[in-house]
Amino acid sequence: MKNKIYLPVIFGLVTAIAACNPTPPIDDTMLDSGKYSFAVPDSLQKRLVSNYIANPTEVQKNTPVIIAAHGYSATTFEWDELREYADSAKTFYVSQVLLGGHGRSYTDFKSSTWQIWQSSIRDEYVKLSQKGYRKIYLTGSSTGGPLIIQLLTTTLFAESPGLKGIFLIDPIVVSSDKQLSLVGLLGPVLGYTETEMSDGEKGKWYVYRPQETLRQLMSLIDLTRRELQRGIKVPDEIYMKVYKTVKDDAADPVSAVLIYNGIKYDNKHIDVEMIDSRLHVFTRLRGRTEITEKDRSLQRKTFREMEAKMTK
């Protein structure tokens, strides 16, 4: 996917057009239209473990369950391949959360905050903990990463036991897109950005990204970076690993370094693995126009490592 940002060429025009906030040309084939909502009850029912296993047995409570959080402007589609892997392996469950404001309509997205995005992760975790699941894991891709890191700064996991580990895939703490920093300066002048998608990606991501949500994204990653610089204390019993591609047009690889230095254990460090790939969220291959055997191998290896850690 490629982004196109609508910016005035001459900054002197900013004042003159400050009242402009263009509305994108949305049609009914786009997720932005609200015609293809991922938030309908049937969709949520089959993707959330807390819903489709309403009354877990003791065996199910002892089976690992991983809450999978997708990235900015994406949907649960981003983790479908992990879900299919788990369904085949039958050793763990995947609970695919739809971030608040996502998978609905452009209007819903535009009015959402990063705290609203995060709320679905928190809610599913609390429900699983209350149902007695003893081996809960979290995984987040891209923006799902800082959303999960922010939960580590709260009392959530002390109040609701069960968290055993966290896997972050291409987490964004520093953006590779330097134009993103202009969002705070230009504000309403920016309006929105447009994302170019393959046929296989259409209907799974928002085409248009309102400047209001870009500002929320910047607020989230800026706050997360500051929290990491101060240090975030994590109990030794919670495992954590970051997988980060070395070439990434969305999340700068230095994000992995900041997370490594910022997560504080008493007697260990988090694990970090730099992945030889140019794909952002290399674990999501479906919908891409070009996939190599190396891409497939990296995805399989990562899923197997996650499974092994959860089931050992």
Predicted feature locations:
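C-terminal motif of bacterial Sec signal peptides marking the signal peptidase cleavage site
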Residues: 17-19
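Short, surface-exposed "cap/lid" segments of acyl-processing enzymes
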Residues: 42-102
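Serine-hydrolase catalytic core
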Residues: 58-60, 208-279, 297-307
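Histidine-bearing beta->alpha loop at or near hydrolase active sites
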Residues: 101-103, 274-291
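Catalytic nucleophile-loop/oxyanion-hole region of alpha/beta-hydrolase
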Residues: 104-137
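Gly/Ala-rich beta-loop-alpha elbow adjacent to hydrolase catalytic centers
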Residues: 139-144, 148
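Conserved hydrolase catalytic core segment
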Residues: 150-164
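Active-site nucleophile loop of the alpha/beta-hydrolase fold
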Residues: 166-178
